C-alpha cells in the first residue's frame, strides 16, 4: 500500500505461541511509511510434544490509517516474552558468584557477600546474601530490598519501612497467640488453615481460612499497592508454605515435624516447594490459586540464603528489616505441631529459629514480600543513594 499504514505480525500453526522480545528494535504493532522497513525480534515456542510448523505473516491495514486486516486463522502477536532470570540480572548490571555457600555458617563467618544461584520451581534463581549494598529498590513510594530474582525472571522484594517511615508499621505486628490460635490441630499449621478434626492430610491442610499473618499482609497490600495504583507492576509468584512432613502424619493432633524445621537444623535450605497445595499463588498455573492478593512473607529458607543461621548475627541485609529492639518477624515456614500447639519459625536478634520455646514469647512482624515484573525497573544502580526505580 502507498502512504502510511498500520502494521502488525500474525502467526498460525498448531501448538504455537509467538511473542516479541523486550529488546526488539521496532514495536510489534504501529505504522510504517511506504518503502520503509521495521525490524521485530520474535520468540516462537512449540507448546506441544511433536514437531509443528509456524507460519508468520506481515499484517497491514488499508491506506490512510485503516484498521489491520487479519486473515482467518491468524493471531496477532501482542505479548512480550518475559525476561529470563539471567537476562534480568544482566539488565540490572549485576553479576553472580558460582560458589555455593556453607549455610551452617553466617555470611559474616564465611565471608559470603554477594549474589549466588540456586534452583527454584521455575528455573535458576539469583539470591542476595550478606551485607550487600546493591539491592535497594524504590517502588510505590516505599523502600524495598531485593531478596532474589525468581526463576521465571520476576523480582522478589521485601518491604523496608525504615528509610521512608523511620519506624515499623504497627499494623503488621502479629501476636504469637493470634498467629497460632486456636493451635489445637495440625489444621492450623500454615498461611491458610484447613479443617480441624479431619482424618486425611488433604482436608487438614485444605487452605480454607486465612491466618492472621495473611490477613495482615493482605490488608497492607490493598492499602499501599492496590489503592495507590501500582498493582499492574506486581507479578504472580510462588510463596511457599511448606507443610511437607519428615516425621508424623500432619493430621489431627498427631505430633508432627515439618520439613522447614528439619532444613533449619541441618542447614540445607531450598527454594523449591514440593507440594502444589503449599505454593501460594493467585493463579492456578504456578500454584494453588488461593491468594486473592499477590503478596506473601519471607520463608525460613530465604532467610538462611540471605546469611542467617541459628546464631545471632547482624551482618546481613535482612537484619534491620526483620528485627528491632523489641520484636522479630514471622516467616512463612511451619516447624511442628507439638504438645498440642502449632509452631512456625521466626527471626529474632538476627537469628532464624526453629525452636517453639523462643518464637512464641513475643509478638512479631509480618513483613510483606512481593514480586514485580522483570522489566519493571527502568533506572538506578541499586545503591541506597541511587536505588533501582520503578516508574
Tell me what each language-model feature is.
Residues 2-12, 26, 30, 34-391:
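Long, domain-scale functional regions
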Residues 22-23:
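Short, hydrophobic beta-strand segments
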Amino acid at each position: 500500500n502507498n502512504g502510511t499504514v498500520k502494521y502488525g505480525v500474525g502467526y498460525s500453526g498448531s501448538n504455537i505461541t509467538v511473542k516479541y522480545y523486550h529488546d526488539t528494535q521496532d514495536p510489534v504493532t504501529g505504522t510504517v511509511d511506504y518503502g520503509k522497513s521495521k525490524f521485530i525480534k520474535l520468540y516462537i515456542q512449540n507448546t506441544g510434544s511433536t514437531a509443528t510448523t509456524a507460519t508468520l505473516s506481515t499484517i497491514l491495514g488499508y491506506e490512510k490509517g485503516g484498521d489491520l486486516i487479519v486473515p482467518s486463522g491468524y493471531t496477532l502477536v501482542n505479548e512480550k516474552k518475559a525476561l529470563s532470570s539471567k537476562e534480568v540480572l544482566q539488565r540490572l548490571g549485576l553479576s553472580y558468584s558460582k560458589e555455593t555457600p556453607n549455610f551452617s555458617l553466617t555470611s559474616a563467618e564465611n565471608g559470603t557477600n554477594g549474589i549466588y544461584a540456586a534452583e527454584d520451581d521455575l528455573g535458576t534463581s539469583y539470591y542476595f546474601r550478606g551485607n550487600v549494598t546493591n539491592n535497594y529498590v524504590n517502588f510505590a513510594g516505599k523502600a524495598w530490598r531485593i531478596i532474589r530474582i525468581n526463576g521465571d525472571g520476576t523480582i522478589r522484594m521485601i518491604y523496608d519501612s525504615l528509610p521512608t517511615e523511620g519506624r515499623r508499621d504497627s499494623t503488621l505486628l502479629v501476636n504469637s497467640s493470634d498467629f497460632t490460635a486456636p493451635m489445637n490441630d495440625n489444621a492450623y499449621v500454615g498461611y491458610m488453615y484447613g479443617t480441624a478434626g479431619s482424618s486425611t492430610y488433604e482436608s487438614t491442610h485444605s487452605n480454607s481460612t486465612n491466618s492472621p499473618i495473611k490477613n495482615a499482609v493482605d490488608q497492607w497490600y490493598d492499602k499501599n499497592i492496590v489503592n495507590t495504583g501500582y498493582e499492574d507492576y506486581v507479578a504472580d509468584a510462588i510463596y511457599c508454605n511448606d507443610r511437607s512432613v519428615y516425621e508424623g502424619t500432619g493430621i489431627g493432633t498427631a505430633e508432627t515435624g515439618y520439613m522447614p524445621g528439619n532444613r533449619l537444623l541441618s542447614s540445607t535450605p531450598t527454594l523449591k516447594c514440593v507440594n502444589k497445595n503449599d505454593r501460594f499463588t493467585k493463579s492456578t498455573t504456578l500454584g494453588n490459586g488461593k491468594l486473592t492478593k499477590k503478596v506473601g512473607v519471607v520463608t525460613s529458607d530465604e532467610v538462611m540464603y540471605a546469611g542467617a543461621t541459628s546464631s545471632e548475627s547482624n551482618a546481613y541485609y535482612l537484619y534491620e528489616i526483620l528485627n528491632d529492639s523489641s520484636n522479630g518477624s514471622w516467616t512463612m515456614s511451619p516447624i511442628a505441631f507439638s504438645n498440642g500447639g502449632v509452631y512456625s519459625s521466626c527471626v529474632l536478634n538476627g537469628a532464624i529459629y526453629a525452636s517453639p520455646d523462643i518464637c512464641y514469647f513475643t509478638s512479631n512482624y509480618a513483613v510483606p514480600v512481593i514480586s514485580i515484573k522483570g522489566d519493571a525497573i527502568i533506572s538506578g544502580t541499586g545503591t541506597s543513594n541511587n536505588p533501582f526505580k520503578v516508574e
